[in-house]
Regions:
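Bacterial Sec-dependent N-terminal signal peptides
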Residues: 1-25
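N-terminal hydrophobic alpha-helix used for membrane targeting or insertion
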Residues: 7-10, 31, 70
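Intrinsically disordered, low-complexity segments enriched in polar/charged residues with Gly/Pro
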Residues: 25-27, 49-50, 101-103
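Mature N-terminal segment immediately following signal peptide/propeptide cleavage
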Residues: 29-63
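Active-site-adjacent, His/Asp/Glu-enriched structural segments that form or flank metal-binding
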Residues: 55-57, 65-190
Length: 192
């Protein structure tokens, strides 16, 4: 009887998930804001620019790359995440920590409004709430985005340092997930 109930529960869950997926596919596309200027560069980069006066004299900068863990082979696990970390350790135009130092000098704080993340299908770098009152700030921020797309410094020292950081992040994440799984298993398989 317990097996029958569990199998019925799983079947109901599958039906609900498939219904939700079918419904999601029927949704109309999200309309594009007419105030967004969209273009594509010769190198394939698609850009979106939208003027926003609130807050005044501030800008947000993002670069989303269609590269994530899905692009890795089994022997490359974590490479996309490692590259994300290396982007903050030096680029063609910002050596060492000078990228973070420059952004801090114009009012951008690492962690609060300067960060990045890697997911399965993409890597996104961003810095937000950037004061644009300094005449060269926007140009310098665009140069940072350019460097993040094609100018990350890949020195042996930086790679070795960040490899340890990425491994520790992974271990911390796995330990937390493992604890959640271990707590859930007795409830999922109660009485078996």
């Amino acid at each position: 009887m317990k097996h029958l109930l569990r199998n019925l529960w799983i079947a109901a869950l599958i039906v609900c998930c498939n219904f939700q997926q079918a419904f999601a596919q029927q949704m109309p596309p999200i309309p594009i804001d007419k105030n967004v200027r969209i273009g594509k560069l010769d190198n394939g980069l698609t850009y979106y620019i939208r003027k926003n006066n609130l807050p005044a004299n501030r800008a947000d900068f993002y670069i989303a790359q269609k590269v994530g863990s899905i692009n890795e082979n089994d022997d490359q696990r974590g490479l996309a995440h490692l590259l994300e970390h290396l982007a903050f350790n030096g680029t063609d135009h910002f050596k060492g920590n000078s990228l973070q130092d420059y952004l801090q000098s114009i009012g951008v704080e690492y962690g609060r409004n300067l960060n990045a993340y890697t997911s399965v299908e993409k890597t996104v770098y961003y810095f937000t709430d950037v004061p644009t009152t300094r005449p060269t700030a926007v140009d310098s921020c665009m140069l940072i985005l350019k460097d993040w797309s094609n100018g990350i410094s890949l020195t042996k020292e930086a790679i070795n340092d960040e490899r340890d950081v990425v491994h520790n992040e992974y271990r911390m994440r796995i330990v937390g997930q493992q604890r959640m799984i271990e707590r859930s298993l007795p409830k999922l398989y109660q009485g078996e």
